[in-house]
Structure formats: C-alpha cells, structure tokens
Amino acid sequence: MSASKEESLSPDEMRQKLYQTFKSRGLLDTLKTQLRNQLIQELQAPVRRGESASRRSADHTDSVLVSACNSVVVDHLRSAGYEYTLSVFQPECGLSKDKVLSSRDVLQIMKISPHMPLYKSLVSNIQSGQSGFLKSLLMELTDHSVYRDCSDNSTQTTSIAAHKESLVEKMQLIDEEYEVLRHRGDRWASVEAKLAEYRKEIQEQAQIELNAKLQHFMDVEIAKVKQEEKERSRKEILELRRDMEKTYELKSEALISREKNAIERLQKHQEIEEKDIYAQRQAVLREIESVRSREMELRQRMEAFDKSCALHEEKVKTMEDLLRRRELSVKTMEDSFEQKLKSELLKYQLELKEENMKRPEKLTENEERIRAEAARLQKEAAVVDAKTEDYERKSSEVKQLLMELESSRSQASLLKQQKELLREQLENMRDYPELKKHTLELQTRISLLKQQLEEKQQHNQRLTQELSAPSHEHLMLQAELRRLEAEHKLEKEELETQKNVLHTQLQHEVQQCALLKTQLMECEERTKWMNTHTEELKLQLQQTQQGPALRGPKSRTVAPEHDSDMVISALSRIRELEQEAERLEEAYRSHQQRALSAEDPTLHRGSQNYSRATAAQQHRVISRSPIFAGRPIEEEHEEFSRTPSPAERLASPPARRLSSTPQSASRSKRRADEEHDEHSLNPECVKGSSNTDRPALMFPERLISPIPAEELSSSISPNSPVMKSTTRHTQSPAKLQEILLSSSSQESSPQPEKITLHDLTEPIQMVSADQPCLLKDCEPELQQDHPDVQISSSSSSSSSSQREEEQQRETHTLQQQPHEEQTQEQRDDAGGHVTSAASPTGGAEEANPLQRYMQMLMQDKQQEQSPNKESSGSHEENLQSESHEHSAGVISHDEADDDFW
C-alpha cells in the first residue's frame, strides 16, 4: 500500500509533469501560435475593425513590396532562430508559409540582375548558410559604402555614387507604384468583405433547412417501423399460446394415467421390499459386528508398531551417546598425542638439521605419494558415490513403504466414514433396489479392502522387522560414509589452499628470479670494476715504488709491503665476490627447496603427517638458527644498513653478507644526509686526505646498491612471517621476543605459511652470543607450527589449549623483558667504551655507530696480525714511523670505510 501511495501523484505534480512533457514536445508553442493566429484573424475582421483595418489588410495582401519586406523579415527571424516572434509576426502580417517569397524573388523585385556581383555574392552567402538574406544584404551595402572612394589609377573606373543614386531612384519609383496600386485596391476591399459575409449567411441558412428536413423524415420513418413491429409480435404471441395449450392438455392426460399405474406398482413393491429389508438388516448387523472386531485387531497392531518405533528411537539415542563418548575419548587421545608430539619434536630438531640436505628427494617422494593418494581418493570417492546411491535407493523404498502405510490409515478412516454412512442409510432406508445394488457394491469393496488390508499388514510387519533390525553392514557403511565425507571435505579444502599458496609462491618465485638476476648482473659489474680497480692499484704500486727515492730510506722498506698487502686484499675481495655469486645461486636453490617443503599439504594421517610437519619445522628452525652467532649485533646492523664503497671493499676483511640482502631506501637516504653533514662539518679531514703523498682512491659515483629503492619499498612489508622472525637488533630484545611470539601464533593457524617476495630477499638473522635465551623461548613456539596446522583443522578444543599456552608464553616473555633490557644496556655501554678507546678522531665521531663498527673491524684485523707482529718487531717499528707520515691518508681511509656495506 505504501509503495502504491508513493507511486501515485498529486494533481499539482501531475499538472507540472504534463506541462513539462507538452513543453518539451513543442505542443505549448504550437497552441500559443494557433491562439495568436485566431486572435489576429478575429481582430482583422473587416466588420469589427472598420474601413481603416480593411485598407491595411488590402495593402498588406496586395502590395508586392510589403510582401517582399515581410518575407525578408521572416527569413531573418528564421535564420536568427527567433521562432517565438516569428509565430507572432506571420499571422499578424497575413503571410502563410506558401506566400513567403524566396531570396531570388526579392532580388528580382529589387531589380538586381543575376549578372551583377552583388547578386552572386548574396546568393553564395545564402546557399552556404553563413548568414540570412537581410544580414548579407546589409554587409554588402556597408562594404560597398566603405570602399566607394577607392579607384585604380591604372584603369578607367567610374565612381560608385552614380550607381547608388540609381538605386535610390529605383526605390522611389517602386514606392510610387506601390502608392498607386494601394489606392486602386481600396475600392474593392469592402465589396469583397461583404460578399464573403453574404456567402457565409446563405450557407448557414441552407444548412439549418437541411437539418430540419432530415429530422422530420427520420421521425416519420421510425413511427412506421414501430407500428409494424408491434403487429408482428402480437401475432406471434397468439400462435405460441395456442400451441402451448394443446401440448399442456396432452401432457396432463398422460401424467394422470401414469400416476395411477405407479401407485399400483408402488403398493406391490412396498410389500416385497419390507420383507427384503428385514433380511438385509439382519445381515448388516452381523457385518457391523465383524467390522468392529477387525477394528480392534487393527488398533492392537498399530499400538505394537508404535512401541517398536519407540524402541528403535531409544536404540538410536544410545548409539549417539556411545558415539559422543568415543569422540571424547578420541579428543583425549589427540591431546595426549599432541603432548607426545611436542616431546618428540624437541628430539627431532637435531635430526631434521641433518635431513635438510635430503629434502629434494623427500619432496619427490612426497609428490609421488600425493599422486598415489589422489588416485586412491578418487577410487574411494567412486565407491562412496556408489554406496550413497544404494543408500538413497533404500531410503526411497522406505519412504514409499511409509507412504503406503499412511494410505492404509487413510483407507481405514474412509471405512469408518462409510460405516457411518451405512448407519444413516439403515435409518433412512426407503428405496430397496438402490440399496440392494449399493450393498452388493459395498460387499465387493469390503472384500477387496480385506484383501488389501491383509496384504498391507503382512507388508508392514515385514517392513517393521526390517526397520527394527538394521544390518551391521548398513551401520558400517554409514560410519564409513561420514568418515569419507569428512576426509573428502578436508582434502578438498587442503587442495584449494595448496593451489592458492602455490600460485602465490610461483609469482613470488618469478619476482625473486628477476631480483636475483639483477643482483647477479650487479655482482658481475662489481667484479669488472674490481678488475679495473686492481689495474689502477698496480699503477699506484708502480708510482709508490718509484717514490721511495724521494721520501728517504725509511719508507723504502715499508711502502712496497703495504701496497702488496692492498693488492692481496683486492684479489681476496675478487675471490670473495665470486664465492658470493656462488652462494647466491646456492641460496636461491635452497630457498626453492624450502618454499616447496614449507607448502606441503597435510593430507595424510599418522607418520606422513609427522614427516611433513617436521619438514616445514626444519625450514623454520634453519631460518631462525643462530648462524654467525659470534658476530656482534652492531656489526650486523651496520653491515646490512649501507652499501660498500670501493676503497672499503679493498681494505675491509672478507664480507659475511650476501649481496641479495635488500637495503632500505630510508636508511640509505639518512646515511647520505649524515655523510653530507660530516663532510660539511669536517673540512679539515678532506684537506688532510687531499694533501697526502699517496692519494686514497674513492669512487663515490661507482657505488651500487643491491636493489633500487622503488623495488625495495614494494618488496618489503612488515607482515610476513619471516620478517617477523628475522627482525633487526634495532628493536629492543623484548620487542624482538614479542615479534617472534606473534609470528609463532600466526603460524599456528590452520592456514599454511605464505611466502612473500621480501621473504626471499630477507637476510638471515645474525644472533649474538648473548642471546640464546630469546631463541630458547621461541623454539617451542616454532616447533608447534605444523602440528597445530594439522590438529586445528580436526578439532576446535586443541586451538583453545594452544591459545592458553601462548598466553602463558607471553607472560613468561614479559617477565624476562626487564632482565633482557638490562643486559642489552650493559652490552651497549661496553661497546661504547671500546669504541671510545679505539677511535682516532674526536668526540663527534665516537657517537657514530659506523665509526664504532670500523674500529671493531680494525681491532679484529690487528688481532689476526698479532702473531706476525711478534715475529717481526722491526717491521712493526717501520709501520709506526710510516703511520706518522700518512696520518691524513688513514683518516681518508676511515672516512671511506663509513660507506662500507
């Protein structure tokens, strides 16, 4: 109702809509023009307007010049688009569309010959549609008046004034002719108007007379037709009355004779029927007693059937209780099994590290197993489908039998109704033959119903026996069906998740391949650059070998050895780069293997599930294992936060970082700003480096970042599981522990671990020697990743227990946070003291972590060279003497070391 009310419009809205539609279609404009035309025609009537109006209309219609002017105005209004004024002007001036003169006719009236240039220009403008006739005429006239004084001296030309005077004279002549014609037309205008009025009056009188004659003729004819019809109907009614009276008399005589015969027959029949009715009453009473006894038997059988159904329901309930108990026992077994798994996983960690090299073989075996299991599952699905079809067929048969039971009940109710009808018929029994026939029909029906009842009772008994005692095979099939359906659903879900994960992994692998290719190209470029740099160093060697004669006897023994050390370090750096390229290829292959092993589907039960879970766990353990545990965290941070300069690559010890590790764009920008500030604040260092005898080779234009900033920002996201497990030391240990816990809680979800692009390019976590407690706290969480994936899909109770365990671990980590923070502060203080003692520059450079890192590297280098120093004391003295001479060069090398990594 509300919708109909909303759809219905008010009368005002309806008027507005009609007005808008008429306006858009142009009906309003046409109506307005018609009304204006009628008003103007009425106002122009000669009787109302008098002689002056008749003169004006005659002048307008008869004068050629006025019609030409009107047609020019009409053409101008039409070309300018003034339709409203045009609709008013046309009826007012008395011009119809047919009487409007064309532009050529107007030019002919103006006596402009077609050979004149004015005629040609006007016609061309009108045909091109640039402007109307009046506008083009005015333009030509203005152009003519503007250029009238122009004349060519080389040719004999006449002025345009004579032509203009001739035009004026022509217009005056036309006006005079127009006046003469107007005076002539005034005589006949009033006569024509009167003749038109007389014609109208005569036509109206003739029309009135014609209508009166037609009306009189129609009245006379209608009266005649009515009288004829009345006479015909009266004659027909009389004939029908006579026929009806004759037939009525004949029928009444026949009915009287029939009534007499019928009364006699009825008396005889009543005597016979009374005897038959008495005998039938006795028989019906006997049948009623037999029907009652059968009803009692049917009721007893129905009660027995209901009792058997109730017993069957109780059995089903007991079976459900048993199944619930079994489920509870299974859950308890699963919990105990989980605990065993947790204990066994701790033992298997060491074995899994050894099995890491055998992963490709295991992967191929797993693929073959998956294929075999897929074929087996397809076969089992076909068997299950066949069993389900059998089950549906049997259930349909049971439904049909139940329908037949209901139909038998409905037939029993129908029998009751028939019995009541029989009672009523016994009470109101009058017609003997009909009753006899009805009784015979009832007897036949009763016999048929008895047979049907007996058959259905036997059938029902057989069905109840079958239903009450279900077969053991049927129960086993139902249980297997449920189990197989659950397994099939799980397998489908796992296959879908595996497909999605493999698809995403494929995309990530493609992107990683592209990144690794670019990084390999960069490594090749670096090797080329190193080759060129070695050549430059050789040239520098030659120069330094030529220079000792100028420096004196002290530097002769030291400079060649120092230069040879630099060449050896450069060659070692080239070898390291080649090894790094090989490591890159190995890392890419191992990552492919890890990605495949991490995404294995958990389709199998028993030992196969454990093997897959441990394989994925092995990946996580290796990615989180404390490789390079002996290195400090500051060194690792500075190593991964900046790109190496060429001079640092020569002077630094062997690098421990893969070139595939990404460099953060924000860190690189920050580092560049810091270097710019340092160079601006310390110009003395730059001067010192430029004044040294041996120039420090620095190539800032050749610094190559491993990954561009755009690709890095797209590839690195903080939400990946590997990113969470391999965070830098810039965060506090408590934050690191929280991130590890969050990653373990995310990995314990039933969804498999997804590998993103930055996971492939992420460096391995460098864990210091004093952080084993963090890894020990995180290990049980990492061990539970894949078992939780398998168990969470089977039961929801295990997930709740896992959440409780995770909460306990979080509380444990929160308790350990203060202790870890204290140890971290102490370690930072110790590192600060070491760097302050070893730094050669002022206090401004001590706060710089890069300077600290370089000093630590120098200390390591000195420790490595300490046995050589003990053996050669004289060599050490020479180095000390040379260090005073080349202090500015050392400072320049230290500045170059800031750009290392």
From Swiss-Prot:
Tissue: Widely expressed.
Biased composition, class Polar residues, residue ranges: 605-617, 712-734
Record PTM: Phosphorylated. Phosphorylation at Ser-659, by the cAMP-dependent protein kinase PKA, triggers ubiquitination and proteasomal degradation of OFD1. Also increases its interaction with TBC1D31 and regulates its function in ciliogenesis. Ubiquitinated by PJA2, upon phosphorylation at Ser-659 by PKA, leads to the proteasomal degradation of OFD1.
Keyword Phosphoprotein: yes
UniProt entry keywords in alphabetical sequence: Cell projection, Cilium, Cilium biogenesis/degradation, Coiled coil, Cytoplasm, Cytoskeleton, Nucleus, Phosphoprotein, Ubl conjugation
Coiled-coil residue spans: 164-512, 564-600
Modified residues (Phosphoserine): 659
Record PANTHER family: OFD1 CENTRIOLE AND CENTRIOLAR SATELLITE PROTEIN, ORAL-FACIAL-DIGITAL SYNDROME 1 PROTEIN HOMOLOG
Protein family membership: Belongs to the OFD1 family.
Complexes and interactors: Homooligomer. Interacts with TBC1D31; regulates OFD1 activity in cilium assembly.
Name of the protein in its database record: Centriole and centriolar satellite protein ofd1
Species annotation: Danio rerio (Zebrafish)
Name of the encoding gene: ofd1
